[in-house]
Each structure stands twice: as structure tokens, then as C-alpha cells.
From Swiss-Prot:
GO molecular function, one term: structural molecule activity
Keyword field: Acetylation, Capsid protein, DNA-binding, GTP-binding, Host cell junction, Host nucleus, Host-virus interaction, Inhibition of host innate immune response by virus, Nucleotide-binding, RNA-binding, Suppressor of RNA silencing, T=3 icosahedral capsid protein, Transport, Viral immunoevasion, Viral movement protein, Virion
GO biological process: symbiont-mediated suppression of host innate immune response; transport of virus in host, cell to cell
Annotated site (Involved in viral capsid assembly and RNA binding): F1025
Organism: Cowpea mosaic virus (strain SB) (CPMV)
Signal sequence region: none
Entry-annotated residues carrying N-acetylmethionine: M460
Stated consequence of mutating V942W: Loss of capsid assembly
Keyword flag Transport: yes
Name the UniProt record assigns to this protein: RNA2 polyprotein
């Protein structure tokens, strides 16, 4: 047990301070269970103390202390402690007093504390040096977490002040300063001006404000009668503060450019470049010193731009990544008093240029570009000075006067070494000139014209012609300057749907025209702007119709002008009853970014205007619509279809059909199939265009569908239509269509178009591009676009409510698998045809087949296959039995204007069933680009194998237009590819079959208007036999039976 004397000695040891304890709890054990006591601010020098962190139950057991023997010393120390308790005013009033009262209780309780042995006490204690180190670390952390301050220097540190004390006092009394009225030479600083937010996108551009908008001088129509004040501002320093919202442990990096938008040259515009991490936590601070003088105007806050780039941003697109604010310090200047930079600014700040303040060891980089002139650059410059005096009216006689051009001064300074004289001047006088002969000046080395005083440069020197005569730039200017043609289209009062109103080559539109840009259109070699068509007409308000203007890259044969065929490349539908004018732009070169008049002439670009839907109410007279053709300053962009790459946006322009709803309360239903890989047409023939043929290359597809719906009747006829996606097994009597996800479109009087978007969430899986024409609607298993009258169709005039639906394109297109093909076609927009191979497979599509004549005229016969245009031409004998299939690969080759890539060909040669010893036949195969006898063969093959043989080879289509080729086009003398087969014994060599497939690098662009492709009802010739009346399902049986019999 402790004695009272021992307890008092503990107090004496406690008052002798050795090391302060901050936030350390000392605890003891006693029988009465007294809790912990905090002795913050106290002292402890005992070597045997048990210390615990503040998170635990802190317990300090006071060990066996050596008690003092002298009672006088004890009472002296007790009185001294009591005096400190009462007189101290700093910390003892709180911490020490609390501890002192605790020790008074401890003195009373020490009598009942157990007596511990010295060994157990030493095993529980720790050295007091640990407590000292923790106190030092706490002090360092407390000092390191101070609030961040602005790093921008003060104006008085950057400039030498020239303002009077009165101006300084007046500035202090004003909350808002009008910069135009501020005293010249007065520095200013604007802090924490919000710039904007950095978004999660590739590039973000933010304006750097120099001052608050309300401090900018406003435009005024009067001038105050006072001395001129501030006219410009010197921008000395800009501090950009970027508060990132990203995670503090992310690897997000940001690149930033401080750009002066006054310059157009990149080398002069970029003022500072810096890269910094975009982690959250402490903000990124960048201090730049532009040292730029800017005039006070309303555009002051738009001059400097901050361009942000996030290369590895993983934040959701469009979200806010960081918030940007700026601090700006500068000085007001005028024509009387300019700014005077301080020595600190010129020697330190201006030399530094820009600096990124680093926090927590972040990786930051900063660069300050410079574009100072060099001696080599100075030599390449040429300074031209040209000053002309105004014209003077001169009196010729009493009844006549004329204007005479005044004198002009021309002065040129050039550093080119090619010129003998870098500096030359000419003064020209226009009056009193005589027709004196030209003479050569040996000093100038030029021919002088004494009449006008001009210096005549020889034509072999390029300086005179470099600025004007060899100008190859595109046509530019206003609509009046770029208008090159105008076309009149007659809208007959008897116009009906399907009528062709205008169909001619685009080049022929210019013939006979005499507008400002007509000559420029015809004579410019390279035109980079798109062609704009503006159509205007004015019809009665109660009438309506629908016209379509379409542009296609070419035509072949007796091509079809059906709306399904012509709208696939560039087209626009227009209802003059709803909209009196319309315009659209197009690129006549679909696989390049430039074109010329000669190019569209020789490639035969076709322009067609047709009537899709006739008059709702016929006008009393014919109507004229005018088309104005011009070149706009909009860069041409190619539209290329890639086989290997899944395109983000696949333009289709597929005409889904014309929907007619009669007036009344009946709920009419119209359905349009989304198996859009095939053509459309009538019985025994089908129409094909390039985009639909291209999409049929895949067996299945999926994507986000974008439809354009156009009102094609009078605006006085109204209806509300519901559009939805469902399968074809729904009958017209099904009354719960709107239980599916649907869109309701209410067409107003002047509502002409609307866009419908069906995302991929509408479809659980992909679906087939083609469906067999014999399959019923209940069994095809593919989605349909439904259009149902929501309420009723009504109007103040008689007539039907007509809608035109066009599938504009597919976003995020995904093609799946290889399409084996279907031969057949339904009516418009139903089903398609054909076989094809996918990019990753070796599936060949049957394209063409030819059988030798049963009774050949000679021992040598030949046939030529046009591999691109899909034609078979027998040579010397017309009794060949030929058949052309309609697979998607053939449809693409025939309907695509421009093609590029590799085509793999498989030629199967089948012979008669004779003995090998009796075989006496050879086949010579020639791959040619032209059938002219002067052209050489590209490849030559010889087949002498008995029975049958298979030949595999490939060829590349590479053309002059960005690698694309237009087969047999007069432009650039382009050719096509032919495969000529010559058989020496046609009685033994009986059949040639050509199969083809595309390589994954194959690409196409542009559409060719083609005639309808016939559908053959005959079975293709069979091996060794020619049965025309058997079913396809029996072919394998017949062939197998024949083989067994043989």
C-alpha cells in the first residue's frame, strides 16, 4: 500500500517538467474503479509509465516512486503548485487546474492502491522518447495543413506605381471600377472569377475573363468632355485555379493551352502549355505571365482561351470533370501614361513565363513557347506598300468631263536572294501620259512603260503571277458570288405520284447559264465546298404534294427512276404545301473531299426530280419551282462503306414506303418490314440500290434505327399517328397496339417532317437481313415498323392523309455472320435476294454460270465474264446457255459507283464424263482490264486437267479517286475487269462457273441507277445434265441417281 508521504512525493515529481504531453492520457488502477484522466499540458519524466493512445482505454499506473524524506521540501512544492494554479492565465487555468484537482483525489486514493512489483511495472512501460517524437509529428502536421492561398502576385509587386494618393483613395471607396474611367497607371487585381466547367469530352474551350463584365465600357453614341482615361489594359499575371471532381487516387491527366485568340497562327497564338494531373483533393494552380496589352472593349473577356484536353478520361461523357476560376492582375494604361513593370517582374516573372504550383508531389509540366523572328524568316518575307490618291474630276471641254486616276505609290521590300534588287519604288502619274515606246532600264533590269510609268516584269519570272493568275483555290463568297446555275421545274396541274419531273446529268444544268460563278465552276480544278440546292415555289395553302430531289453518281442502261432507287445516295423530300422553300447540300464526290465540274461531267453524276405523291387538290394552272445551285463554304466529307469495320453511322436512305390513310374514324394499320437487306420491286423483277445491297452482305444485323417521316398531303388534312416496333404476326384487328412501347406523332398544319429513333433496347437480339418471299408474316420472326391511326383522320378538304417513311441510317451498326442469300423479291420494301460471304469466312457466292453450246460451230469456243458489271458475253457462238445470279456481292458490284479493295475469284470448270485416255481439251483463262486487242493480259492460266478443275485467284481494284475506281468511266480513262475463258474442245469442256467473295478491305461509295434485275424461274444448269422443269428439292436426287448409273 502507498503511504500519504509517497503520494505527496508523486505530486512533487509531476511538477518537475521534463517533456510536455499533448493528447496523452495517463491512467491508473485502483480498487474503487476510478476512470481515466486526461493530463494534457502536464509533464512527466518518470521512466516507467504505461501510455496508451487516445482511442483505447488509457491507463497509467503510477509506479513505486522514491518518496522524499524532507517534509519541508514537500510543503514548499505543494504551496508552489497551488500558487501556479491560482495565478497562471495561459493554460494553467484550464489544463493544469483540472489536473491539480485530479491529483488531490489521487492523494486520497493512493492508500488503497495495490503495491506492484518493480518487474511487472517495467515490463509494461515504454521510453518517454516516443512521446516526444509523437508531439513533434503532431506539431508538423498541424502546421502543414494550413489553408491554401492565392499565388498570384500583387499589382504593387509587378508595377511601379505612378498614381496619386487621391486616385488610390477613390479606388478604395468604389466597389466597382469602370476600366475606361480608371486612372492610367493604376494596378488592379480581380480574384475568383468563375470561368466554367471542364466537361468529359475530348476538348473543352473556356474563355478567360480579364475583368468582370459589368466593369467593361459599354458602347456609346456621345463623347464626354473630359480627359482621356484608360484605353488599354496590361495583363501582367493570370492564375488559373482548377478544382477537380475526380477521385484523388485516379490517373486522370489533363493538358491545357492558354491561347491568345487575336492571332490566327498557332505558333503565335499559344502562350502557355502545361500538363497536370486531374486528381481530386488539392486544386491545380497555374500562374502565367502573359505580359500582353489588350484594348478596353466588349471583347476583352473573349480574347484569352483555355483549351483543355483529357486523353485518358474515363468519366461519363458530358459530365463535369473540374471547375475553373481565375485571378487576374494587371495595370490600366492610356495614351498619356503606360505601365512601368517592376524589377521583380522583368527579372523573375517575365523570365519564368508560367509555373504550375505543385501540391503533394504531383507530376506537373509547363512550357512557354516562343516564336521570335529569325534571320532566315526575315529573308522570306516581302513587304508591299501601295498607296493611291483619290480620282480627280478633270474638265475636257465645256461639255465634257472625266475622272482621272490619281497618283499612286508602290514600294516593295523583299529579302529573296533570287531578286537582284530587293528594294524598288515606282511613282505613277495617270494624267498627261503619252504613247511612248517601251524601253529597257539596265539599272532596274526591267522594261519600263513610259506611258503609265509601270515596271513590266518578264513573264518567266513568277512574282507577278504568283498572287493571281495561278490561283487554284475553291470558289468562295456570298450566295450571289457562288451561284452558278438555276433550274426551272414544271409542276403540272395533272401531276401524279411517280411522274419524273426532271432527269438529266448534273453538268448539263450549267449549260447556257451565265451567273457569276458559272465560269469559276467550269474552270476551277479543285473545288472543296459542297453544292447547295435551294428550291422555292408558292402553291395554294389548301393543296399539297411531295417532291424528291435526288443525286446519284451514275446510271447504266435503262435505269429505273423509282423513289426506292434514286433516294439511296443524296436526296431530300419536300412538301411545298407545308414549306414554301427548302435547301440541302451534298458532295458530288462520295469518296473524296474535293471535286470539279469536269469530274462530275465525265463520271456522269445524275440529278433527278420526281413526284412521290400527287396533288391533294389540283391547282388551276401549272406551277413552276425554281432550283438555285451554288457552292457553299462547307467542307466535303466522303461517305464510304467499309466491309471489315462496324461503322458508327451507316447511312442507308432506304425508302420504306408511302403510307396512305383515308379520312375517317377507322383505325388503319400499316406495317413496314425491318428486314431491309434486299431490294424491292414487282413480280419477276426487283430493284436494288447500293446501301441495301451492302447491308445484305451480313446474315443478321442490329443497331439504332433513325426514320424520317414526311407529311405528303395538304396541311388541311390532319391525323395523329402511332409508331411502334412489333412482329408481323399481329393482325389488323388487333386492338392493343399501344400496349407496346410506342411514339405518338400529331401532325400540325405546317408540320412537314419528324424524326423517329428506335434504340437497340427495342430489340432483344439481332434479326435477319433477308427473309424468303414464301415465308408468311407469322413465321418470319423479324420485327416490323407499325404505323396506326391513333384517333382519327380528318380535314376541311377531301383527300387522303399521306406519309412517306425513309430509313435515314443506322447508328452503332453491327453485322453478324455470312448471308447465304435468298433469290426472290416481294413488292416495295418487303423482301430481297442474294448470297454472299462474311469478312472472316471463305464462303464464295455463285455469281455467273455459262454452259457451252450443245452443238458447237468449231473446236474452239470462248466466253467473257465481266466481273464488275455482271455480264456474260459469248464469243463466236450465241448458243451458250448463261445464267446470272443475284447475290448481294453481285448487287453491290453492279450498284456501287466507286469500288476499292480485293476480290477473290473461284472458277470452276466442269467437263464431260469421258475416259482420261480420251480427254483432249484445254482451257486458257485470261484476266484483263480491257477487251481492246492492244491491252495486255494481267494474268494468264492454262487448265488441262481431265474431268473438272478449280482455279482460285484474286485481283485488286485500285482507282484514281482516293484509291477508288469507277468501272468504265470516261473520267481518268478507267477500265473494268474481265475474265476470258477459251476452250479448245467444247464437247468435253461443258461448263464455267464463277464464284466470288470480297476481302475484308473492300470498300464502296456512291450509287448507280440500274434497271430492274430479272428473277429467273429456271433452275440453273446442273452438272452434266440440263433439266429445266425439275424442282430444286429433286436436284440432289437426280444427280445422285445419275452418278450411280454412271
Amino acid at each position: 500500500m502507498f503511504s500519504f508521504t509517497e503520494a505527496k512525493s508523486k505530486i512533487s515529481l509531476w511538477t518537475r517538467s521534463a517533456a510536455p504531453l499533448n493528447n496523452v492520457y495517463l491512467s491508473y488502477s485502483c480498487r474503487c474503479g476510478l476512470g481515466k484522466r486526461k493530463l494534457a499540458g502536464g509533464c512527466c519524466s518518470a521512466p516507467y509509465i504505461t501510455c496508451y493512445d487516445s482511442a483505447d482505454f488509457r491507463r497509467v499506473q503510477y509506479l513505486y516512486f522514491c518518496l522524499t524524506r524532507y517534509c519541508c521540501l514537500y510543503f514548499f512544492l505543494l504551496l508552489l503548485a497551488d500558487w501556479f494554479y491560482k495565478k497562471s492565465s495561459i493554460f494553467f487555468e484550464t489544463e493544469f487546474s483540472r489536473g491539480f484537482r485530479t491529483w488531490r483525489k489521487i492523494v486520497k486514493l493512493l492508500y488503497i492502491l495495490p503495491k506492484f512489483e518493480m518487474e511487472s511495472i517495467m515490463s509494461r512501460g515504454i521510453p518517454s522518447g516516443i512521446l516526444e517524437e509523437k508531439a513533434i509529428q503532431f506539431k508538423r502536421a498541424k502546421e502543414g495543413n494550413k489553408p491554401l492561398k492565392d499565388e498570384i502576385p500583387k499589382p504593387e509587386d509587378m508595377y511601379v506605381s505612378h498614381t496619386s494618393k487621391w486616385n488610390v483613395l477613390r479606388k478604395m471607396s468604389q466597389k466597382t471600377v469602370d476600366l475606361s474611367k480608371a486612372a492610367a497607371g493604376m494596378g488592379f487585381i480581380n480574384k475568383h472569377m468563375l470561368t466554367g466547367n471542364i466537361l468529359a469530352q475530348p476538348t473543352t474551350v473556356l474563355d478567360i475573363p480579364v475583368t468582370k463584365d459589368k466593369t467593361l465600357a459599354m458602347a456609346s453614341d456621345f463623347i464626354r468632355k473630359e480627359n482621356l482615361k484608360t484605353s488599354a489594359i496590361h495583363i501582367g499575371a493570370i492564375e488559373i485555379i482548377i478544382q477537380s471532381f475526380a477521385s484523388p487516387e485516379s490517373d486522370l491527366m489533363g493538358g491545357f493551352l492558354l491561347v491568345d485568340s487575336l492571332h490566327t497562327d498557332t505558333a503565335n497564338a499559344i502562350r502557355s502549355i502545361f500538363v497536370a494531373p486531374m486528381r481530386g483533393g488539392r486544386p491545380v494552380r497555374v500562374v502565367t505571365f502573359p505580359n500582353t496589352l489588350a484594348p478596353v472593349s466588349c471583347d476583352l473577356n473573349n480574347r484569352f482561351k483555355l483549351i483543355c484536353s483529357l486523353p485518358n478520361c474515363d468519366i461519363v461523357q458530358g459530365s463535369q470533370v473540374a471547375e475553373v476560376s481565375v485571378n487576374v492582375a494587371g495595370c490600366a494604361t492610356s495614351i498619356e501614361k503606360s505601365h512601368t513593370p517592376s524589377q521583380l517582374y522583368t527579372e523573375e516573372f517575365e523570365k519564368e513565363g508560367a509555373v504550375v504550383v505543385e501540391y503533394l508531389g504531383r507530376q506537373t509540366y509547363c512550357a512557354q513557347p516562343s516564336n521570335l523572328p529569325t534571320e532566315e524568316k526575315l529573308r522570306s518575307l516581302k513587304f508591299d506598300f501601295h498607296v493611291e490618291q483619290p480620282s480627280v474630276l478633270k474638265l475636257s471641254n465645256s461639255c465634257n468631263a472625266h475622272f482621272v486616276k490619281g497618283e499612286s505609290l508602290k514600294y516593295s521590300i523583299s529579302g529573296k536572294e533570287a531578286e537582284n534588287h530587293a528594294v524598288h519604288a515606282t511613282v505613277v502619274s495617270r494624267e498627261g501620259a503619252s504613247a511612248a515606246p517601251k524601253q529597257y532600264d539596265p539599272i532596274l533590269g526591267r522594261v519600263l512603260d513610259p506611258r503609265n510609268g509601270n515596271v513590266a516584269f518578264p513573264q518567266m519570272e513568277q512574282n507577278l503571277f504568283a498572287l493571281s493568275l495561278d490561283d487554284t483555290s475553291s470558289v468562295r463568297g456570298s450566295l450571289l458570288d457562288t451561284k452558278f446555275a438555276q433550274t426551272r421545274v414544271l409542276l403540272s396541274k395533272a401531276m401524279a405520284g411517280g411522274d419524273v419531273l426532271l432527269d438529266e446529268y448534273l453538268y448539263d444544268v450549267v449549260n447556257g447559264q451565265d451567273f457569276r460563278a458559272t465560269v469559276a465552276f467550269l474552270r476551277t480544278h479543285v473545288i472543296t465546298g459542297k453544292i447547295k440546292v435551294t428550291a422555292t415555289t408558292n402553291i395554294s395553302d389548301n393543296s399539297g404534294c411531295c417532291l424528291m430531289l435526288a443525286i446519284n453518281s451514275g446510271v447504266r442502261g435503262k435505269y429505273s427512276t423509282d423513289v426506292y432507287t434514286i433516294c439511296s445516295q443524296d436526296s431530300m423530300t419536300w412538301n411545298p404545301g407545308c414549306k414554301k422553300n427548302f435547301s440541302f447540300t451534298f458532295n458530288p464526290n462520295p469518296c473524296g473531299d474535293s471535286w470539279s465540274a469536269e469530274m462530275i461531267s465525265r463520271s456522269r453524276v445524275r440529278m433527278t426530280v420526281i413526284c412521290v405523291s400527287g396533288w391533294t387538290l389540283s391547282p388551276t394552272t401549272d406551277v413552276i419551282a425554281k432550283l438555285d445551285w451554288s457552292i457553299v463554304n462547307e467542307k466535303c466529307e466522303p461517305t464510304i462503306y467499309h466491309l471489315a469495320d462496324c461503322q458508327n453511322w451507316l447511312p442507308l436512305n432506304r425508302w420504306m414506303g408511302k403510307l396512305t390513310f383515308p379520312q375517317g374514324v377507322t383505325s388503319e394499320v400499316r406495317r413496314m418490314p425491318l428486314s431491309i437487306g434486299g431490294g424491292a420491286g414487282a413480280t419477276q423483277a426487283f430493284l436494288a440500290n447500293m446501301p441495301n445491297s451492302w447491308i445484305s452482305m451480313w446474315r443478321y444485323f442490329r443497331g439504332e434505327l433513325h426514320f424520317e417521316v414526311t407529311k405528303m398531303s395538304s396541311p388541311y388534312i390532319k391525323a395523329t399517328v402511332t409508331f411502334l416496333i412489333a412482329f408481323g404476326n399481329l393482325s389488323d384487328a388487333f386492338g392493343f397496339y399501344e400496349s407496346f412501347p410506342h411514339r405518338i406523332v400529331q401532325f400540325a398544319e405546317v408540320e412537314e417532317k419528324c424524326t423517329l429513333v428506335f434504340s437497340q433496347q427495342e430489340f432483344v437480339t439481332a434479326w435477319s437481313t433477308q427473309v424468303n418471299p414464301r415465308t408468311t408474316l407469322e413465321a418470319d420472326g423479324c420485327p416490323y415498323l407499325y404505323a396506326i391511326i391513333h384517333d382519327s383522320t380528318t380535314g376541311t378538304i377531301s383527300g387522303d392523309f399521306n406519309l412517306g417513311v425513309k430509313l435515314v441510317g443506322i447508328k452503332d451498326f453491327c453485322g453478324i455472320g455470312s448471308n447465304p442469300g435468298i433469290d426472290g423479291s416481294r413488292l416495295l420494301g418487303a423482301i430481297a435476294q442474294g448470297p454472299v460471304c462474311a469478312e472472316a469466312s471463305d464462303v464464295y457466292s455463285p455469281c455467273m454460270i455459262a454452259s457451252t453450246p450443245p452443238a458447237p460451230f468449231s473446236d474452239v469456243t470462248a466466253v467473257t465474264f465481266d466481273l464488275i458489271n455482271g455480264k456474260i458475253t459469248p464469243v463466236g457462238d450465241d448458243n451458250w446457255n448463261t445464267h446470272i445470279y443475284n447475290p448481294p456481292i453481285m448487287n453491290v458490284l453492279r450498284t456501287a459507283a466507286w469500288k476499292s479493295g480485293t476480290i477473290h475469284v473461284q472458277l470452276n470448270v466442269r467437263g464431260a464424263g469421258v475416259k482420261r485416255a480420251d480427254w483432249d481439251g484445254q482451257v486458257f483463262v485470261y484476266l484483263r482490264q480491257s477487251m481492246n486487242p492492244e491491252s495486255y493480259d494481267a494474268r494468264t492460266f492454262v487448265i488441262s486437267q481431265p474431268g473438272s478443275a478449280m482455279l482460285n485467284f484474286s485481283f485488286d481494284i485500285i482507282g484514281p479517286n482516293s484509291g477508288f475506281e469507277f468501272a468504265e468511266s470516261p473520267w481518268a480513262n478507267q477500265t473494268t475487269w474481265y475474265l476470258e475463258c477459251v476452250a479448245t474442245n467444247p464437247r468435253q469442256i461443258q461448263q464455267f462457273e464463277v464464284n466470288m467473295r470480297f476481302d475484308p478491305n473492300f470498300r464502296v461509295a456512291g450509287n448507280i441507277l440500274m434497271p430492274p434485275f430479272p428473277l429467273s424461274t429456271e433452275t440453273p444448269p446442273l452438272l452434266k445434265f440440263r433439266f429445266r422443269d425439275i424442282e430444286r428439292s429433286k436436284r440432289s436426287v437426280m444427280v445422285g441417281h445419275t452418278a450411280t448409273a454412271a
